[in-house]
Amino acid sequence: MKSFTDNLGRAWTLVVNVATIKRVRALCNVDLNSIIEVEEDGKPSARLLERLSSDPVLLVDVLYAVCKPECDQRNVSDEDFGAAMAGDAVEQATDALLDEVIDFFPAAKRAAFQRILSASRRFGEAARKRMEAMLADGDFEARLVSELERLTGLSRSAQGSAE
């Protein structure tokens, strides 16, 4: 079982089993069983993973559905649950959910999915490091302003006189 902590400091435990997958299907119309699929040509497909990563509202709805028995025990509504989910809490919950979903699968499938997820995480970490390096570059803001000026046709002096 994996866990995460929301922005109110509440710890939540994720348990993915057949009942959980059924509950998420019913409440969110999302099939966690297809988080990663292998296409006919043998290539991995992560359409659901992409959908969840691009829609934080759906992601938190899925997390709530997974945590629903615990939420019911604590009298936490989906609105209250969602209000405590932002930033690092969402990232931590996403990692825990993905690990727990992958642990649900039988050994052979689990091993393949763990490799796919590991590669995805390495790619994400490399992208994060590139972004940090770009932001640390002293010329970044000047290049950004220059590009915005080019795109809008406005210059800094024109912006100052318009204010």
Language model features: what each stretch is:
Residues 1-10, 32-57, 61, 68-163:
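Charged interaction scaffolds used for protein-protein
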Residues 12-14:
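Short, isolated positions in well-ordered beta-strands
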Residues 19-37:
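Short, surface-exposed, low-complexity cationic segments
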